């Protein structure tokens, strides 16, 4: 992690289809150090390493410099939790704040994990983009949560229409599905860039409700997608 806020190491990485907080994409990450759920603490760890490099610039004496850096890094968790909660409220089209918001969000994530629901497509379903009409969204466990969500949407002068408009600004309808990226790479290696150009054209408008892109919205049929690290 650089002081500019940019990330430098981009691989191995991939996009998560079915929601699983333990998802990893590196063949050597056996303990889940870089799993989806471990991104916040590993980000804090990276920031701590960055702070170590800045110690000589923070204070002329090392001890007070370390104290300042430590206190600053310790603020990360509370800042992250607040930002994450606000982000998830936007993804669910929730205006204002409610004491039960965190539970509502975590209940949905837990349901996704238990039912192997696609992360991106679940939010699309809530936005009434029913491109696949999966039966899992008709089960009672989801419908019970859905009713709670609808009741929350109508609070704080909200409406379904206003909520969906907010959701459309915060939820992509299409992401670079790993299997589609692999297809494009394989074709490009055989001097065929048509799949690459098509994929880039679709991904250039991730928040639009585009026509005839269902094939790019479907998760891979494989249970696992693994990338490899050369280190």
Regions found by a protein language model. Name each.
Residues 9-28:
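Flexible glycine/proline-rich, aromatic-decorated loop/lid segments
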Residues 1-3:
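Hydrophobic residue at the +6 position relative to the catalytic HRD Asp in the kinase catalytic loop
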Residues 30-231:
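Regulatory N- and C-terminal appendages and interdomain linkers associated
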């Amino acid at each position: 992690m650089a002081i500019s806020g940019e990330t430098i190491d981009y691989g191995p990485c991939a996009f998560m289809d079915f929601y699983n907080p333990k998802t990893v994409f590196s063949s050597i990450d056996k303990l889940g150090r870089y799993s989806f759920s471990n991104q916040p603490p590993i980000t804090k760890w990276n920031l701590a390493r960055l702070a170590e490099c800045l110690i000589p610039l923070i204070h002329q004496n090392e001890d007070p410099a370390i104290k300042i850096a430590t206190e600053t890094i310790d603020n990360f968790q509370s800042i992250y939790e607040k930002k994450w909660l606000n982000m998830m409220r936007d993804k669910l089209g929730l205006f204002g704040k409610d004491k039960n918001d965190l539970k509502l969000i975590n209940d949905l994530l837990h349901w996704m994990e238990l039912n192997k629901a696609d992360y991106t497509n679940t939010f699309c379903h809530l936005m009434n983009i029913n491109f696949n009409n999966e039966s899992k969204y008709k089960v009672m466990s989801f419908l019970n949560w859905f009713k709670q969500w609808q009741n929350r949407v109508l609070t704080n002068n909200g409406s379904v229409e206003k909520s969906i408009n907010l959701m459309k600004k915060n939820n992509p309808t299409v992401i670079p599905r790993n299997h589609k990226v692999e297809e494009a790479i394989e074709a490009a290696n055989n001097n065929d860039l048509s799949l690459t150009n098509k994929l880039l054209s679709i991904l250039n408008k991730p928040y639009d409700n585009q026509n005839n892109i269902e094939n790019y919205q479907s998760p891979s049929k494989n249970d696992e997608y693994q990338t490899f690290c050369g280190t």
